[in-house]
A protein has these predicted regions:
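Alpha-helical metal-binding/catalytic segments enriched in His/Glu/Asp
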Residues: 97, 106-146, 231-237, 243-269, ...
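Active-site metal-coordination/substrate-binding segment of hydrolases
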Residues: 62-66, 71, 75, 79-181, ...
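His/Asp/Glu-rich mid-to-C-terminal helical/loop segments that flank catalytic regions of hydrolases
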Residues: 5, 56, 225, 243, ...
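Active-site-adjacent substrate-binding region
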Residues: 17-20, 32, 36, 177-225, ...
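Acidic/His- and Gly-rich active-site-bordering loop/insert found
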Residues: 7-10, 17-108
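Zn-dependent metallopeptidase/amidohydrolase metal-coordination segment
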Residues: 23-26, 33-36, 98-99, 366-416, ...
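Midchain, well-structured core segments that form catalytic/ion-binding scaffolds
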Residues: 10, 144-145, 149-310
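A short beta-alpha structural unit
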Residues: 45-50, 282-289, 301, 307, ...
Length: 480
């Protein structure tokens, strides 16, 4: 474990703990906005980014920020930042925490919400104890982390750190035809604070794991070392519609069969490449989608992830080669476009070590682990030292009202975050050195007119697919 003992806090701060009941009450209250129920009656939320439900949640959380005396800023992409002043009015860069409050259509109560509301609870805990910190403390929630309505996901934090301009983001068109810029204005969150935003002294995000590893291994918390690289593609397969009964198998150009072959290859490739590589086909739409008609077109998404950039790139190469060969053998055309492409992100070893040390100091089991999901923290790592804390997720379930983390773990997670933020704020260690570069290779938008076809299999150079995928737009992009 890499731990600098200059992070050690005095006893007056090392014993400080949050008010658990207050945190849990805020989580439940926020969860009542956009309410849905799981199949067994579990409470969940549906708050797609920049919808009326998102606006209501923003108003609630922003009101809580103001009640706590935070200086609230809304930036050009609708990110909201609440800042607590330092002891001497210092204008030093703040120690920041935060996450997101938008959800997928089938959201639970904790994804994102925990990180934001734990930050507010930390502010209230400091206020109640009449403790002022050497550096400002900041709590943020970022716009459109999920990518469920607008692509790319993590849009707000991407714009905040300069990986995408606000003007480019404004022109993204969502699954319902709405523009990001128009919707920001409509809900009243087209802010004036410029982007890119201020670089924090450090950023730490508390989040549920959204996976089964911690629970399966009987470990309470994770010290997150980084985030897997992500490669998202959308494929449009154009074959030939024909009669299901009269067309011999040897004479078919079946888009549905081709999609099935691709889905099988994605799984086989992941198994062959081994852990931690994963591959997923999350969406398939067939046209005309009739029981007695060979499918003319298929639109599908492919999600490849790995913690090693070289391996991820190799998986993309092998996938592209397979798709080209398959298109030729089946007599179909396959057009692909990139939805998002992020390199793996390594978090700051000093902050990871601090998280590990704090987990152990407060009497908990912990482990170093990468994140399989994308998070706002990976964007903030572009501009400051960053790490994350993971709590257990029961059965690994997330993006589902059945998402559950033990209340005691939610509370302890917030205590860990409090102690880590205090250590970062109160020490003189020069932690704000330039972080390692984090390349965002490609981000294109799944539903806007600016999406470029990046590869076409089975079509001569200069050709184009005759598939009309406008009718096959997925209902909801997979959230990171």
């Amino acid at each position: 474990m890499h731990f600098d003992d200059r992070f050690v806090l005095p006893k007056s701060l090392s014993g400080l703990r949050i008010n658990g009941q207050r945190l849990l009450k805020r989580i439940a209250t926020l969860g009542e906005i956009g309410p849905i129920q799981g199949k067994n009656g579990e409470p969940g939320s549906a708050r797609l980014a920049l919808t009326d439900e998102d606006r209501e949640a923003r108003e609630l959380v922003t009101a809580w920020m103001r009640e706590l005396g935070l200086a609230v800023r809304i930036d050009a992409i609708g990110n909201v930042l609440g800042v607590r002043a330092a002891a001497d009015g210092s204008t030093a860069n703040p120690v920041m925490t935060g996450s997101h409050i938008d959800t997928v259509r089938t959201g639970g109560l904790y994804d994102g919400n925990l990180g934001v509301l734990a930050g507010l609870e930390i502010i209230e805990t400091l206020d109640t104890a009449r403790i002022t910190t050497r550096r400002p403390m900041a709590v943020a929630f970022f716009t459109n982390e999920e990518g469920a309505r607008f692509n790319p996901d993590m849009m707000g934090s991407l714009v905040y750190c300069g990986g995408m301009s606000a003007e480019e983001a404004y022109n993204v068109v969502g699954i319902d035809g709405a523009r990001v810029g128009d919707e920001l204005a409509r809900i009243g969150y087209l802010g004036t604070t410029p982007c890119p935003g201020e670089a924090p002294h450090a950023f730490v995000e508390l989040h549920i794991e959204q996976g089964p590893v911690l629970e399966a291994e009987g470990i309470r918390f994770g010290a997150v070392t980084g985030v897997q690289g992500i490669s998202w593609q959308e494929l449009t397969i154009s074959g030939e519609s024909n009669h299901a009964g009269t067309t011999p198998m040897s004479l078919r150009h079946d888009a549905g069969y081709t999609a099935a072959r691709i889905a099988t290859f994605v799984r086989e490739l992941a198994l062959e490449m081994g852990q931690p590589h994963v591959g997923t086909v999350g969406q398939i739409t067939l046209h005309p989608n009739l029981v007695n008609v060979v499918a003319a077109t298929a639109v599908m998404t492919v999600d490849l992830r790995n913690t090693d950039e070289a391996i991820l790139t190799e998986s993309e190469r092998r996938f592209s080669a397979f798709v080209a060969e398959l298109a030729a053998s089946e007599g179909v055309t396959i057009a692909s476009r990139v939805l998002a492409r992020f390199e793996p992100v390594a978090f700051d070893e000093r902050v990871i070590g601090l998280v590990e040390h704090t987990i152990a100091r407060l009497g908990n089991s912990g482990k170093r682990m990468p994140s399989g999901a994308g998070h706002d923290a990976q964007m903030l790592a572009r501009m400051c030292p960053t790490a994350m804390i993971f709590t257990q997720s029961h059965k690994g379930i997330s993006h589902n009202p059945a998402e559950f983390t033990e209340p005691a773990d939610l509370v302890m997670g917030a205590d860990l975050l409090l102690q880590v933020m205090l250590s970062l704020s109160e020490t003189d260690i020069a932690i704000s050195a330039e972080p390692p570069a984090v390349a965002i290779l490609t981000t294109t938008h799944a539903h806007g007119s600016d999406v470029a076809v990046t590869h076409t299999a089975g079509i001569p150079d200069g050709g184009s697919s005759d598939g009309d995928d406008d009718d096959d737009v997925p209902d909801e992009q997979i959230a990171a």
